[in-house]
Each structure stands twice: as structure tokens, then as C-alpha cells.
């Protein structure tokens, strides 16, 4: 996992904003973050959805989760984005649980072309890999915060209007 993160050009210490820019460059997309109250109390704690037409990826997190938890959820979803070859996303319909989850929780009025989400536990190899990569990413963010303690950035700002 360490090698993959290095291969993607992620510095040892990075701000959250810089990390997102690295992942956007790798994927060729814009990444947005959404606090979604419909995820509050759900079995799935986060989701990555994307639209290949608009080239926008969205990371959904529970609105009631603590900021630190949201950071780890975002790291996990960014881990999926870095682990996958751009364009190889799971299509809706590949797994009926994905379709059901997106229809019932995230966006009932709109079809989302693809999604990764954590319906399975971390015994699923893809989920475990994203979690390990996400942990490495969060560690690099925390190192970046330590090195740049004078910066006035708060993670929760990624969800501001």
C-alpha cells in the first residue's frame, strides 16, 4: 500500500486540500464532499459516487459523524479512487446492493452511473485495501498538519457551501 501511495505521487506530509488535488489529477475528475443526513445511523458509513459525464466524484459522509470520523471516511473513499484504475468503476447493476443503496439513501431521484461503497465489512479485499490506503492518507494529512501548524485549515471546511 505504501508503494501505491508513493506511486500516485502523494507526499509524506500533505494537507487535505493538496491530497484532494493529487487524487483529482490522477482520476481526471473534480471531487466534492457531501455531508448527507440520510447516511446518519446507516450500516454504510460512507460512499463514493461519480458521474463520468460531468467527471465529478462525490464522497458522501454521515452529517452527524464527528469531524475526525469524516476524515477517515473521506480517506477510505479516496483510497478507493487511488487503488482503482480510472474508468474501471463498478457500474450500477453489477451489484444489486449498490443500486438499492444509492436509490434508497443517496439520490432517489437520479441515476448515478457508478459507485463504490462499503456495504461489505473489511473482509472484502477491495474494502480492506481502501481502508489501508485511507489510513496511510490520513497519516500523511496528520503529518502535514503537524509540519504546518500555523495554517488555519479545518477539515470541516471541505463541506462548506
Regions found by a protein language model. Give the residues of each.
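Auxiliary, metal-adjacent structural segments of Zn-dependent hydrolase domains
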Residues: 1-49
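Short, well-structured alpha-helical patches and their helix-loop capping segments
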Residues: 66, 70, 74, 122-129
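Active-site scaffold of zinc-dependent metalloenzymes
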Residues: 29-71, 78-84, 90
Amino acid at each position: 500500500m505504501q508503494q501505491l501511495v508513493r506511486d500516485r505521487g502523494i507526499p509524506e506530509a500533505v494537507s487535505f486540500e493538496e491530497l484532494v488535488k493529487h487524487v483529482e489529477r490522477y482520476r481526471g475528475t473534480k471531487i466534492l464532499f457531501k455531508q448527507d443526513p440520510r447516511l446518519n445511523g446507516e450500516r454504510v458509513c460512507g460512499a463514493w459516487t461519480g458521474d463520468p459525464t460531468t467527471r465529478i466524484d462525490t464522497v458522501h459522509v454521515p452529517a452527524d459523524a464527528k469531524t475526525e470520523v469524516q476524515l477517515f471516511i473521506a480517506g477510505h473513499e479516496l483510497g478507493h479512487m487511488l487503488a482503482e484504475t480510472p474508468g474501471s468503476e463498478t457500474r450500477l447493476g453489477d451489484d444489486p446492493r449498490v443500486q438499492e443503496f444509492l436509490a434508497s439513501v443517496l439520490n432517489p431521484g437520479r441515476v448515478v452511473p457508478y459507485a463504490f461503497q462499503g456495504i461489505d465489512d473489511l473482509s472484502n479485499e477491495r474494502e480492506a485495501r481502501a481502508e489501508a490506503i485511507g489510513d496511510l492518507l490520513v497519516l500523511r494529512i496528520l503529518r502535514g498538519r503537524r509540519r504546518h501548524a500555523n495554517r488555519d485549515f479545518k477539515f470541516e471546511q471541505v463541506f462548506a457551501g
